[in-house]
């Protein structure tokens, strides 16, 4: 699974996922299913926000290429992927500026068009079950919830799907591609079933023997985001970097 993650996700996403796991004391080399899940969630959050801007009249528009007008601003502020301290700083700043209530839990995005925080979910189970779990945890009508599945289903608060159909279809296509690529490598069943994942982990550790824990070869590409997070969220060039990996995975 670790090899799959490094082959199929943009290096910037992989680096952010590793950083997130290490912040919580988790090892991407051991908890590989969680590693894959975090990368998937990060990519969906980026895809959700990409190409969406607000013009000088406050209208939401889509810009897919070129250098947009300087008056345009990103419609979504990405909170997911930041370290906790910085993420809460961003949330507090948004609350102070807009007057919205501070959420109890860190959300994934802030929608400047609808003036609300958004929680993005990606589930391997039924969307309505995961939606209810999210809603029961958040317990706030202020935070909008949008759930995607690997089977093309989705569910959102009050059936408000926020994005246009094409943008949502792009996300669903990417999730379906990830599922197909996992299945072709025999990884999907263990990704879906925790019990199967534990069995696979024991098998992997046994096969690795005394080499377990040694560093593996990683991409030498270093994301500027790790040097300074802010430009990544505001720089339009991140779109091109991520876009290349959306609809394809390199085969072994």
Curated annotation (Swiss-Prot):
The record marks 195, 198-199 as: Important for efficient shutoff activity and nuclear localization. GO terms for molecular function: RNA binding. It is found in: Host cytoplasm; Host nucleus. Coiled coil: none annotated. Its main location: host cell. The active site is at 80, 108. One of its GO terms (biological process) is viral translational frameshifting. It comes from the Viruses. The record marks 202-203, 206 as: Important for efficient shutoff activity. Keywords: Decay of host mRNAs by virus, Eukaryotic host gene expression shutoff by virus, Host cytoplasm, Host gene expression shutoff by virus, Host mRNA suppression by virus, Host nucleus, Host-virus interaction. Signal peptide: none annotated. Pfam families: Flu_PA. InterPro entries: PA/PA-X (IPR001009), PA/PA-X_sf (IPR038372). Belongs to the influenza viruses PA-X family. The probable endonuclease active site in the N-terminus and the basic amino acid cluster in the C-terminus are important for the shutoff activity. The C-terminus acts as a nuclear localization signal. The C-terminus is recruited to host protein complexes involved in nuclear Pol II RNA processing. Plays a major role in the shutoff of the host protein expression by cleaving mRNAs probably via an endonuclease activity. This host shutoff allows the virus to escape from the host antiviral response. Hijacks host RNA splicing machinery to selectively target host RNAs containing introns for destruction. This may explain the preferential degradation of RNAs that have undergone co- or post-transcriptional processing. This is Protein PA-X. It comes from Influenza A virus (strain A/Hong Kong/156/1997 H5N1 genotype Gs/Gd). The gene is PA.
């Amino acid at each position: 699974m670790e090899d799959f993650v490094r082959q199929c996700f943009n290096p910037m996403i992989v680096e952010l996922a590793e950083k997130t796991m290490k912040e919580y004391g988790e090892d991407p080399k051991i908890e590989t299913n969680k590693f894959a899940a975090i990368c998937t969630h990060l990519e969906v959050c980026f895809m959700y926000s990409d190409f969406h801007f607000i013009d000088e009249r406050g209208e939401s528009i889509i810009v897919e290429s070129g250098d947009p007008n300087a008056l345009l601003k990103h419609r979504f502020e990405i909170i997911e992927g930041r370290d906790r301290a910085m993420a809460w700083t961003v949330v507090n700043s948004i609350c102070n500026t807009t007057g919205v209530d501070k959420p109890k839990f860190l959300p994934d995005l802030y929608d400047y068009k609808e003036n609300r925080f958004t929680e993005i979910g990606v589930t391997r189970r039924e969307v309505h079950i995961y939606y209810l779990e999210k809603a029961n945890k958040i317990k706030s009508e202020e935070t909008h919830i949008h759930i995607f599945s690997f089977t093309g289903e989705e569910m959102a608060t009050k059936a408000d799907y926020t994005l246009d159909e094409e943008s949502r279809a792009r996300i669903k296509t990417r999730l379906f591609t990830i599922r197909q690529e996992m299945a072709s490598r025999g990884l999907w069943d263990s990704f879906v079933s925790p019990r199967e994942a534990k069995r696979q982990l024991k098998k992997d550790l046994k096969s690795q023997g005394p080499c377990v824990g040694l560093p593996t070869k990683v991409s030498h590409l270093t994301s500027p985001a790790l040097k300074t997070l802010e430009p990544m969220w505001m720089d339009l060039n991140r779109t091109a970097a991520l876009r290349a990996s959306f609809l394809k995975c390199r085969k072994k």
